[in-house]
Amino acid sequence: MSAKEIIGIVITKSLDKTAIVKTQSKSSHERYVKIIKKVKKYTVHDRENISRVGDKVIILQTRPLSKTKRWVIKSIL
C-alpha cells in the first residue's frame, strides 16, 4: 500500500518541528449539485524546520509520530 500525498498551505509554524497545514477539496452535493469546499487541517512533522507560513507543501502520510502527527513534509513547492 502506497502512502497518501496531499498538497496544502502552511498556516501555523509556532511549534518546534511541527507545522499545521490546511488542505482544501471540492465536491459536488449529490442532490443539489452545488460545489462544496471542504477545508481540513493536519498537524505535520517538519524535521528540519524548513517551512514558513504561507508555503505550499506536499505532505506524506506516515506512521504515528505523536498523538496528533501522522504526516511529514515531503517537499516545498
Swiss-Prot record:
Protein location: Plastid, Chloroplast
Record family assignment: Belongs to the universal ribosomal protein uS17 family.
Organism: Cyanidium caldarium (Red alga)
Keyword Ribosomal protein: yes
UniProt-listed Pfam families: Ribosomal_S17 (PF00366)
UniProt xrefs under HAMAP family: Ribosomal_uS17_B (MF_01345_B)
UniProt name for this protein: Small ribosomal subunit protein uS17c
UniProt-listed GO biological process terms: translation
